[in-house]
Amino acid sequence: MSTIEERVKKIVSEQLGVKEEEITNASSFVDDLGADSLDTVELVMALEEEFETEIPDEEAEKITTVQEAIDYVVSHQ
C-alpha cells in the first residue's frame, strides 16, 4: 500500500497534469502547479474519493499546498 504522501502526490499529478517528480510537499496548487479554482475543487473531490472522507468547503479552502492536503488526510483518518 502506498503512503498517504505518495497517494496525495499521485492525485495531484493526475488532476493537474504535472509530473510527480515536480511536486514537492511545499508546492502550492495555484502558485507552483498552475491550478485554477476549478482544478482545486476537482482536486478536493479526488482526495475525498481516494481517502473515503468528506472535506467541508471551509476546510477545503484552507488546503492550498501538498503538505496541507497530506496533513488534512492524516488528521481525518
Curated annotation (Swiss-Prot):
O-(pantetheine 4'-phosphoryl)serine modifications at: 37
GO molecular function: acyl binding; acyl carrier activity
Keywords: Cytoplasm, Fatty acid biosynthesis, Fatty acid metabolism, Lipid biosynthesis, Lipid metabolism, Phosphopantetheine, Phosphoprotein
Record-linked InterPro entries: ACP, ACP-like_sf, PP-bd_ACP, Ppantetheine_attach_site
Official protein name in the record: Acyl carrier protein
Pfam families in the record: PP-binding
GO cellular component terms, A-Z: cytosol; membrane
Segments forming domain Carrier: 2-77
HAMAP family associated with the record: Acyl_carrier
Function recorded in the entry: Carrier of the growing fatty acid chain in fatty acid biosynthesis.
Recorded superkingdom: Bacteria
Keyword Cytoplasm among record annotations: yes
The protein's annotated pathway: Lipid metabolism; fatty acid biosynthesis
Phosphoprotein is among the record's keywords: yes
Localization (cell): Cytoplasm
SUPFAM superfamilies tied to this protein: ACP-like
Processing after translation: 4'-phosphopantetheine is transferred from CoA to a specific serine of apo-ACP by AcpS. This modification is essential for activity because fatty acids are bound in thioester linkage to the sulfhydryl of the prosthetic group.
GO biological process: lipid A biosynthetic process
Primary localization class, coarse: cytoplasm
Family stated for the protein in its record: Belongs to the acyl carrier protein (ACP) family.
